[in-house]
Every structure is written in structure tokens, then in C-alpha cells.
Amino acid sequence: MVRRAFGQVPGGMFGADENARIGFFDPRQGTETCGFVEQMASDEIMLLISGDPYWADHLEDVAFNSYPASLMPDYRALRYLTCPNMAISDSRNHHPGLDNSGPFLAMNPFSSRCCQHNHGFGWPYYVEHLVLATPDNGVAAVLYNSCKANVKVGDGTEITLREQTNYPFEEMTRFTVGTSENVSFPFYLRIPSWCKNASVLINGKKQQTKLAPGTYACIEREWKDGDEVVLNLPMKYAVRQWQVNKNSVSVDYGPLTLSLKIEEEYKQMPSTETAVWDSKWQEGADASAWPTFEILPASPWNYALRVQSPITLQRRNWPSDNNPFTLSSVPMEFKAQGRLVPEWKIDEYGLCGVLPYENARKSDCLDEITLVPMGAARLRISAFPVAER
């Protein structure tokens, strides 16, 4: 019920800037950083209990699209609230646009202790759930990321399963079996609900295994050392419409939701002067080594998306630091078209204004705009008004 009322936004979460308030469900409302981590943990627990692949799909939505943007790339600061539509990230008090009073949008290393203690669990918990044992003495790849898992299968034989991929930024995942003896066991692969044309190769040969979206594919056979499984999950564009939010739209590419690329201007601030009033830090901490950053928009953000125009993907090199969740490092950008909405502005509370009505005036000029995966955008417009022409 909460999600139906407040979760009609991209990114897998809901508008609850500490409290979910009646009438405050626009995508400019945010979620706490620790809320992202706890939602991911809840999805992981539900996945373990039920085996339902829905929870893995939802986990990916939060992990790829919401959680990364709540943190500075070096993890040395975070902001309390991150929103699907967020045109400014500063140290102002935005109440009553946000429920409570305080500087909740800046990247501060001292503020919001609940989030500071919690944020570091997000990726470790995620990695713990990549590969799971199954009740029939098999193994299931339920989330996709490069890893090595040591697993007991079949009659108790220990095997090593190596996984290589840059998912969700590429479609292919490669698994290699390491075993000292041939062993029979079922190997399950989760097929995401968005993927309509998945394929599997074993040692280079295409398999006829059933690969239905939102299910697990089961490959049961005798495995030998060096066997290789290649899973391909073709990604397509999909447009979602958010009727309760003025029929705004978001664009997905596989598990990634796309955001307008807003150029980010970082402004360093003293952390002790911009922290929330109840913040605490160790006596003697060198605050100069732990600065706060405000992030201000350095390009127009108030665009309506022309959904009829084609969207084209431009791939970039994989980042050398293995962090794809920044504007400078994200390995894919998308070109689309949009029109500025002049009346859609920063509002009286210093926040990205609520979504304009569908008939709001749009610019006559049709601009090329750049979209990026939402998790790489610390300023973002992810729920767009629609430009009809």
C-alpha cells in the first residue's frame, strides 16, 4: 500500500523524506541513504526465504539506480536524501518541501549517523547473495557480478564457480566450472523479468533450455573441469508511465533506468558548519580532511522528453578504477531529444519543482539531450514530462 501511494517513481523506492506524507509523492521527494541499503537487505532476505526472482529484480533496481548516487565516488561523504528528480544538492534547509528541518541534501561525512553507519553494508551484502545453494544440491546464480564462489554440489563435491561480467553495463556473463572430478548437479540462472530473448551457450553450443523472463533457467547435466556457460541477456529500451505523477515517463535499458545528464559543479564546504545539528564526530577529527560537497547544476535540467524520437547508445571504455557510477566514468551514454519547460524551476523551498502538468508550455526548440544510467547521476531528472511533438 505504501509503495502504491508513494512509490510511483523510478529507482525502486518511494517518497519518504524521513516520513511518507499524504500528497508528497512527486519524484522530487527522496529516500534516506540507509533506506536504500535496508531495502536491498530486505530484498535479499526475501529472495533467500522465497526464491522468488521478483526480489532480485527489485534489488537490482535499487542497487543500480538509487544507491550509488547517494554517495560520493570515494565513499567519504554521503547525503541523507536522494531523489529520482534532483536538480540541486546543497546545504540549505529545504523544509517544508522536505519534511524535517536541516541541511539534508549536501554530501557531508559527519551528518546523518544512521546513514554513515549503514551505507557501507550495501555492496558487501549484495556480493554475499550473488551465488546461492539450492535444496536439490545445486547452485543458483541469482545476481550477476564478477566473483569466485566455492560451492558444495551433488553428493558433496566441492567446485569453484568463476563468474566474469560487467553487468549491468554489458549483456554477457561468463561462468567457468572448476572441479577435481566430474559431478552432476543442477545449475540455475535467473532470467530477469525485463529480458525477452535470453540465450545460453555451454562450451560454445547454444542450448534449448527454457529461458522465460522472471524465472530461473535450469541446466542439469554432468559437469567437468573447465566447462563454460555463457549467459546473454539482451537489453532493450522500455518506457514506463507514472500516471499518478502527471503521466510522466522514465526510460529503462535492461535493469538500468536512464536520467538526464546534468553537468555537476562541486563546491567544497566546511563539514562542521554544514552538518545537521545533532551530528557527532570524534574529538580531534581533522574536519579539513573530510570536506562536505554541494553539487550544483551547470547545465539546464528542466527538460521534457520526446518519447517518439529514437534513443541511441554510445559505449565508452570501462573505467580503470572499476567504478562505473560517475558521469566521467559511466561506460554508456544515450542520445535522445527533448524540449525545455520554462516554468519548471527551482521552487520557493530551493528544490527541484514538482513535475509540471502535461499541458505546460514547452520550448519550440527541439534539443539533443544526453541520458546516462541513473545511478551515475548525482543530479538527475529520471521522471520526465512528455514533449508530444
How would you label these PLM feature ranges?
Residues 4-38, 111-115:
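Solvent-exposed loop and edge beta-strand segments that line ligand/cofactor-binding
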Residues 24-27, 38-51, 68, 132, ...:
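Well-ordered alpha-helical scaffold segments within catalytic/enzyme domains
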Residues 31-47, 118-126, 171:
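Well-ordered alpha-helical segments within folded domains of soluble proteins
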Residues 57-65, 70-176, 212, 232-389:
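C-terminal beta-rich recognition modules with glycine/proline-rich loops and embedded aromatic residues
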Residues 165, 177-181, 190-193, 221:
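Non-cytosolic beta-sheet module surface loops
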Residues 182-202:
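Beta-strand-rich binding/interaction modules
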Residues 185-188, 219-234:
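C-terminal beta-strand-rich structural cap/linker in extracellular carbohydrate-active enzymes
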Residues 195-220, 239-244:
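Solvent-exposed beta-strand/loop surfaces of large extracellular or lumenal domains
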